C-alpha cells in the first residue's frame, strides 16, 4: 500500500491502516526530537565464510560495525580511524544514514556491544569491553544467560528514562543468521523469508548453521526469550529487547529500523510479554526499512507471519528512497539488489522524507559524500585475492 499523503510505502498488517496512518502523522511532528540509537554488536557467527556481505572476508567483518558507526557520525572525512571494509558491490548503508541524520539534525547515539575495543568517538558504555563478541551460534551457547539479562536490564533502564521517541538501528555482521535462529527456535519456518546483505541470500548455508545451533542448544519445552538469545542469539537482541520495552513503558513511540533482525527483536518481546499488555505495547511500534529490502515481498511475508502467530497488527514502513537517477555504480548497485539495508538506512531516510526532504536532495548529498570517499581512497570494490 502506498500513502500518497505521506509519500511512503506501507506493508504488513492490512487492518487498522487508517489508525496507523494517523500515528505516523504524529511521528512527523516529533521528527527533530527523535533519539537515534545505533547498536553495533559482535557475534562470531560472522566469521563463517559466505554468511555475510558486511566485509569481503572474516578479518574485515571484525571492524565493519565500528567503521559503520564512525561513518554515520562523520561522513566522508580524512580523519577516519576505522577503514570501511571492501565490498563486492555497493557502498556502506551508513552513507544514507549519515546524510539523512544530518538533514533532520539528529546526532546518533552509538552503543557498542561485544566489539572488543573501546571506540574513540562518543558512545554509550553498557558492558565491559573485555566480554568480546558472542560465540558462534553453532555452539548453541552464544552467551551466558547472566550477560543476556544484564544487557536486557541496561536497555530497559535506558528506554524507561527516555523523554523522546527513539529509533533503534543496528550494524551486526552475521545478524540475519542469529535472527533466523531466534525465530526458528520459536517454531517459525523462515529460512526462505529472511533476507541478506548479500546479492543472493546464502539460504542453504544459513539453514545448516541454524540447524546445528538449535541442535546443540537442546532447548527444552519451557524455554523463554532469554534462553533463546543465550543459546543462538547476539548481544544486539538482548539489549534492544530491553530498550524497546523500556521506551514503550515510557509511552514513547519506537521505530525499529532494519529488516529481519528487527523482526527477531519484536518476536522476542512478544514472546516475553505474552498476551499481557500486548496491544498497548505494539500500538506505537513501527518497523521501518528500505524499499530495496521489501522488493521481493519476503519481509512482508515474514512480518505477516509474526502478526498471525501473535495476533498482532504490526505495520511496516518502506522508504521511497531510490538511486535510479544516480550516476555512480556504487549507488546504482542498490537498485540491482546489493547491500539493501543496514545502519538504520530505511528508518532514518523515512524520517527525512516525513520531514519534507526529497529524493533528489538525498541522492545528491549521497553522491557528494561518495565523491569525497573516492578522492580519499575510502572506498574499494576490489575482490579478495
Swiss-Prot record:
Please, which domain of life does this record's source organism belong to?
Answer: Bacteria
User: Matching CDD domains, A to Z?
Assistant: DMB-PRT_CobT
Q: Which GO terms describe its molecular function?
A: nicotinate-nucleotide-dimethylbenzimidazole phosphoribosyltransferase activity
List the InterPro entries hit by this protein, alphabetically. Answer: Nict_dMeBzImd_PRibTrfase, Nict_dMeBzImd_PRibTrfase_arc, Nict_dMeBzImd_PRibTrfase_sf
Database matches in PANTHER family = PTHR38811, UPF0284 PROTEIN SLL1500
Family in the record: Belongs to the UPF0284 family.
In Swiss-Prot or TrEMBL terms, this protein is called UPF0284 protein PMT9312_0438
The species this protein was found in = Prochlorococcus marinus (strain MIT 9312)
Amino acid at each position: 500500500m502506498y500513502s500518497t499523503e505521506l509519500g511512503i510505502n506501507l506493508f504488513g498488517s492490512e487492518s487498522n491502516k487508517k489508525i496507523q496512518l494517523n500515528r505516523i502523522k504524529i511521528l512527523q511532528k516529533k521528527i527533530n526530537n527523535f533519539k537515534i540509537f545505533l547498536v553495533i554488536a559482535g557475534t562470531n557467527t560472522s566469521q563463517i565464510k559466505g554468511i555475510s556481505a558486511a566485509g569481503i572476508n572474516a578479518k574485515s567483518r571484525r571492524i565493519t560495525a565500528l567503521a559503520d558507526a564512525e561513518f554515520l557520525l562523520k561522513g566522508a572525512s580524512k580523519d577516519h580511524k576505522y577503514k570501511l571494509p571492501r565490498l563486492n558491490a555497493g557502498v556502506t548503508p551508513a552513507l544514507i544514514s549519515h546524510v539523512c541524520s544530518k538533514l533532520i539534525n539528529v546526532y546518533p547515539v552509538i552503543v557498542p556491544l561485544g566489539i572488543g575495543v573501546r571506540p574513540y568517538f562518543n558512545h554509550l558504555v553498557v558492558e565491559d569491553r573485555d566480554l568480546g563478541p558472542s560465540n558462534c551460534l553453532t555452539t548453541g551457547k552464544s552467551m551466558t544467560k547472566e550477560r543476556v539479562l544484564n544487557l536486557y536490564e541496561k536497555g530497559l533502564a535506558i528506554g524507561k528514562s527516555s523523554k523522546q521517541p527513539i529509533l533503534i538501528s543496528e550494524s551486526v555482521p552475521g545478524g540475519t543468521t542469529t535472527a533466523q535462529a531466534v525465530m526458528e527456535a520459536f517454531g517459525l519456518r523462515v529460512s526462505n523469508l529472511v533476507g541478506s546483505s548479500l546479492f543472493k541470500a546464502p539460504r542453504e548455508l544459513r539453514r545448516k548453521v541454524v540447524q546445528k545451533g538449535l541442535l546443540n542448544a537442546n532447548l527444552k519445552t519451557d524455554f523463554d526469550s532469554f534462553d533463546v538469545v543465550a543459546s543462538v542469539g547476539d548481544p544486539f537482541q538482548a539489549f534492544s529487547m530491553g530498550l524497546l520495552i523500556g521506551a514503550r513503558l515510557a509511552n514513547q513511540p519506537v521505530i525499529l529500523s532494519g529488516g529481519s533482525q528487527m523482526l527477531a527483536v519484536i518476536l522476542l518481546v512478544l514472546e516475553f510479554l505474552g498476551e499481557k499488555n500486548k496491544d498497548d505495547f505494539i500500538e506505537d511500534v513501527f518497523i521501518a526499512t528500505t524499499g530495496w529490502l521489501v522488493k521481493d515481498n519476503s519481509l512482508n511475508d515474514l512480518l505477516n507471519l509474526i502478526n498471525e502467530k501473535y495476533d498482532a497488527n504490526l505495520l511496516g514502513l518502506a522508504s521511497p528512497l531510490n538511486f535510479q537517477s544516480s550516476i555512480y555504480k556504487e549507488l546504482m548497485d542498490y537498485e540491482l539488489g546489493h547491500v539493501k539495508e543496514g545502519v538504520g538506512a530505511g528508518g532514518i531516510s523515512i524520517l527525512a522524507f516525513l520531514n519534507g526532504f526529497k529524493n533528489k536532495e538525498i541522492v545528491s548529498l549521497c553522491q557528494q559524500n561518495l565523491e569525497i570517499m573516492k578522492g580519499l581512497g575510502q572506498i574499494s570494490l576490489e575482490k579478495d585475492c
